[in-house]
Structure formats: structure tokens, C-alpha cells
Amino acid sequence: MGFSGQTLAKQAPKGVVGVWAFGPYFCPLHHRFNLSNFFIMEHKGHPPLNLHWDRSGLGAVQNVYWNLGPAELVETALASGEGQLCDNGALASDTGEFTGRSPKDRFVVKDAITENTVWWGDINIPFSADDFDALYDRVAAYLGGKTVYARDAYACADPAHRLNIRVITELAYSNLFCYNLFLRPTAEELSKADEPEWTILCAPGFRAVPERDKTRQHNFAILNFTRKVILIGGTGYTGEMKKGIFGVLNFVLPHNKNVLSMHCSANSGSEGDTALFFGLSGTGKTTLSADPQRRLIGDDEHGWSDQSIFNFEGGCYAKCINLTPEKEPEIWKAIRFGSIVENVVFKEGTREVDYDNGSKTENTRCAYPIHYIDNALVPSVGRHPKHLFFLTADAFGVLPPISRLNEAQAMYHFISGYTAKVAGTEVGVTEPQTTFSACFGRAFLPLHPGRYAALLGQKMKEHQVQVWLVNTGWTGGPYGVGSRMKLSYTRAMITAALQGELDSVPSHAHPLFGVSVPATCPGVPEEILNPRLTWSDPAAYDAKASQLAAAFIKNFDQYRDGVDAKVLEGEPRP
């Protein structure tokens, strides 16, 4: 007899961690029939008291390794050929065909929960419930007879918003990634673990057949809010699991709990003052939040409730292209045994990572638990913020290096989520290109951006938060003419803002964007603060500024119908 992905295992009697299985029928271990096509499904490692395994539909797998620690997972990954050990102790693994997320292959099941709530389009692509069920069963059948790795974890450091997660992975290194990135229950919590609220099933080796499975191609990442399952297949890129849960929280927290979910980093000062840093890739979000004078709450995903700012995660997934101990000492020290480095290249004849080598991808990454950062705040919960920083790498050299935003401008720039791509960041990019990503994380938003902006405006009012727009990009002209803003200047401006040193200095309104530009800042030359004065040709600056303002307005056309009229007061006036 064969077995299928629809087979459901019954939990073994207490003290027994295996079951005999064939087809859809199961017998406890004490009934030992002598049939060659029986196999033992064993639960090994550190299984919770209450498995709830029958809910997974994975009764046909052969071995389930539960909650293995980093050493066990590294050992298993090495033995399975899933990676190599670096000279610093980290596990180096390749994610295969996909070295980044695949947004065109991300789907959301369209059902009674999501039909009238999700912001459908090219970010949230609808998938039918019946097709999901059929695909899930095929993935389960694919895993039949194989070893899988199960982990109970959770998201959200604030206990009031804790989301229990079960991760089931085909590969050991994928499970180690989840150990590092999600929050880790204590041994006591694991022993009492109740049924998980959400499940991630990740099978990189399974390849979908688009004509049969209704996917675009062989890889997929699908969120099902009714079954509370994230189904991933055909891709080994571990970030799909992390961003899958982020997508879940971006729906559940704002929609069900009125909690603002944010794609940002966060840190806390010695007085407990919290600052948030929003920004797209390459804007300095990770670098600027890693301040030795402040404690790191988290580097990527946070919630803002009525009580606190809290990290969604228990670790960091940092870019490591061109990493040096001088530029990023905290990240450099965090790459050690238990960490993962992805898609890196070794220096010839060694196990030393060549961080400058982007031959596999520019998106090389390292994953490590947050306690590997010396000044991390654990638990990762902070007070309400007093300062928010919107970071942009403006390659056109138009935006001021720092400016103060009013409420309308803050919501407008939050929804816009502007930065710029420069030559070398992507194939085909030969000159600066505007990039807009709503709420600095459009790819992860199940709801209309206006919903998140409204919550931001509400929080700003309640807690008297000051929002700053910080340009970490170009000064003295556009990319190719001007130069990149010095990191020391940007740090000085952020420090001055945090310490209140910009509150009383003279300022002027930018003629097009209307933002308030300070005239002076400690540690920064005055001429740097006014971008027009840094250009050799002021008329050329004016023309480029008008061009950028027009790009903002055109981009915002897609959101106008879904936002409050007050938000439009923050729009540029070309």
C-alpha cells in the first residue's frame, strides 16, 4: 500500500514517539505487524508534550526532529550537505536558484476573511482556497517518507500580542534560520506549548506545475488566513518565511487589534527614549539604528500598540555585502557559531568569507539571534517613541539632509516611501531611478497603505511624536556629479534631533516640498543643510527638484482615493 499527503497521523500514546503507518491507516507501536511496507514515523529531538501533529496533514513523513538547538542543526546541515562551516564558526549555505524573495509568486488565499479586506493587486495576488488545499496535499505527499524539522516559536515580544508559530521545514538550515529569526520559547514554555496559531510549511525541493497548481511558475509563497498556514515551495530563500509572518502580522495587528505594524528598526536611549528608523534597502536603516550609545530593540519589523513599541522578531537578517568590522562592528561580531551566512563566497583556499564578492548575488545575508548583538534590549520592548526618522537615499541630490515634517507631511511621505536606485544596484540600472514603496514596505502590506498611515497619524497625535525626513543619499548634485552624504554628518544630525538640539534653531520651508529645514546643526557645515546651496548651478537644482516633486505626485495618484484629505496637504507644490 502507498501513502498520500492526505494521510493524518494519530498521536502516539504517552511516552511513545513513533507510529506505524501505511496508507491512511495507523497502528500504535505496540501493534507490530510484520509488513514490509510499514514504516515508523518517529518524533525525535525535543517534542512538546502536546504535538497536535494530526492537524498538519503530514502523517506520512518518516522522521520529525523537534526543536533542535543550533549545534544539532548545524551538525545535521553539514552532514546533509546543506552548507559549510566558516572559519568564524558560522554556517555558510546557498539558497539555490533564488537569492531573494520572488514578489510575483506571492499569493493570498481569497476567502471570507480576505475578500473585502485585502488590498488586491500585483502585491497581494489572489489564490483560490480549493487550489491551496490541493497544493498543500501535494506538498505533504512530496514530504512522505522524508525527514522534516519542526520548531515551535513565536512572533511579537510584547506578550499581549504574542503569535505562536509552528515551522516545519524540509531542510535543517531553514530551521536554524527560524531559530535565529523568530522568538524562542523557554524550555518550560515548550513543555506546555499549546496548539500553534500559525504554521509555516517550507519545502524548497517541491516544484509546482503551474498548469496543475495554478501558480505562476514552480516556486510559490502563499498565505491562507482561514487555515492559518504559510505554504512555501520551490525556493530555498529563507527570507520568504520571515516575510510571510510579517505579512500575517501586517494584516492581523492593524485589522484586528488597531496596532500599527511597521517595517522599521528601533533603538532606545539611556533614558528609555525610543526612536524608529524607516527606510528601504540601502538607506542606512540598519547602520543608523546600530548606535553604541543606544540599545537595539530590533532591526526590521516592529509593532506600535497602546502600551509599547515591540519587536516582531528574535533575531536579525542583515545584508553583509562589503561588510567590514570598521563599518558594522556589531554585525561583524554577530557572525559566529550559530549564525548563518547566505550565498557568500570564500576567499580562495580558505573558509574565510569574502564579503566583497557579490558573484552569487549582491543580496548576501547573515542571520543571527538578537542576543548576539552586545547592546540588544531583551526583551525587545520599548516605550512610545518621541522621534521617527524616514530615511531616503535620494540619488538626485534634491532633498535636504534633514528636515522636520508636520503630521500631513509625515503621513504623505510614509505612504510614498521614497528612495532611489543607482547604477549597479540592479541589472539594467544605468542612471538614478525613483523608487516608491508604500509605508517603506509595500511588498508586505495586505491592507491599503492608507490604513497604516491613518494609524501613524493617530499615534503621532497621541504621543506628540516628531518625524524627520533624512536624506542619506547625494549632496552637491545628483549621482555621478555630487557625492554621498558623509555618514558622520548623518549621525550628527540624528543625534542632534534626538537630543533636542534642533528644536529651537532657525529653519525655512523648502520651496517645493514644504518641509522645515534647520539652518544649523552641531557637527555639520551649514552649507550642507541647504541642498540648493551645494549645487554649482542653482537653476539645475530647481529643475531637478521640480522633476522629483512631479514624480511624488504621479506616484501618489494610486492612493488618493483611499486616504484622508488631510494627507494631501503634505504633497509637494511644484
Across the structure, where does each feature detected by a protein language model lie?
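Conserved lysine of the Walker
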Residues: 285
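N-terminal accessory targeting/assembly segments
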Residues: 41-192
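Generic C-terminus detector
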Residues: 528, 533-574
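Charged, amphipathic alpha-helical linker segments immediately N-terminal to NTP-binding catalytic cores
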Residues: 213-252
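Glycine-rich, often acidic-flanked micro-motifs
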Residues: 42-87, 263-280, 291-292, 303-534, ...
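Short, low-complexity intrinsically disordered segments enriched in small and basic residues
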Residues: 2-14, 18-30, 34
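A short glycine-rich, hydrophobically flanked beta-strand micro-motif that places a catalytic Asp/Glu
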Residues: 151, 259-266
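Hydrophobic positions on the alpha1 helix immediately C-terminal to the Walker A/P-loop
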Residues: 288
